[in-house]
Amino acid sequence: MKSVITTTISAADAAGRYPSTSDLQSVQGNIQRAAARLEAAEKLGSNHEAVVKEAGDACFSKYGYLKNPGEAGENQEKINKCYRDIDHYMRLINYTLVVGGTGPLDEWGIAGAREVYRTLNLPSAAYIAAFVFTRDRLCIPRDMSAQAGVEFCTALDYLINSLS
């Protein structure tokens, strides 16, 4: 999985050099943000059921037509699959926060997602709406500290932009 640390080391190694001062400063900044990322991961992990339910509900509220015959949420089984997918992405957000890099999202969530959604006639806009809702719903300090919120929103923004 890619993280700031592995990316820095890989770049230095590929160039046949030691990490530069700016490389090390980047790693140091990443380490200093680790506590906030871990707080965000812990909060998401302990509240994931509510987060997923609210995100899915917001998705179906915004895109009510998805429950029409022939659409992605035409029956309870398909609706449950949508919630399952949102939960999967939230788990990947959690992993991304823990490792401090986008590797989990890149490797297990984003690669090919748009093509899969297109092939299965699943609207990626609905998933994006769920993640935008989650990001915009965040309340500091009720949900987590300000820095943890920044880290959480950064991971969500990465996912939103990747699926857009």
Curated annotation (Swiss-Prot):
SUPFAM superfamilies reported in the protein's UniProt record: Globin-like
Pfam families given in the database record: Phycobilisome (PF00502)
Membrane topology: Peripheral membrane protein
CDD domains linked: PE_alpha (cd14769)
Database matches in InterPro entries: Globin-like_sf, Phycobilisome_asu/bsu, Phycobilisome_asu/bsu_sf
Annotated positions binding (2R,3E)-phycoerythrobilin 1: 82
GO biological process, one term: photosynthesis
Role of this protein: Light-harvesting photosynthetic bile pigment-protein from the phycobiliprotein complex.
Family in the record: Belongs to the phycobiliprotein family.
Keyword DNA damage set for record: no
GO cellular component: chloroplast thylakoid membrane; phycobilisome
Localization per record: Plastid, Chloroplast thylakoid membrane
The protein, known as: R-phycoerythrin alpha chain
Signal peptide: none
Gene for this chain: cpeA
Keywords: Antenna complex, Bile pigment, Chloroplast, Chromophore, Electron transport, Membrane, Photosynthesis, Phycobilisome, Plastid, Thylakoid, Transport
Post-translational modification: Contains two covalently linked bilin chromophores.
Lineage summary: Eukaryota, Rhodophyta, Florideophyceae, Rhodymeniophycidae, Ceramiales
Residues where (2R,3E)-phycoerythrobilin 2 binds: 139
Membrane keyword on record: yes
Stored Gene3D superfamilies: Phycocyanins
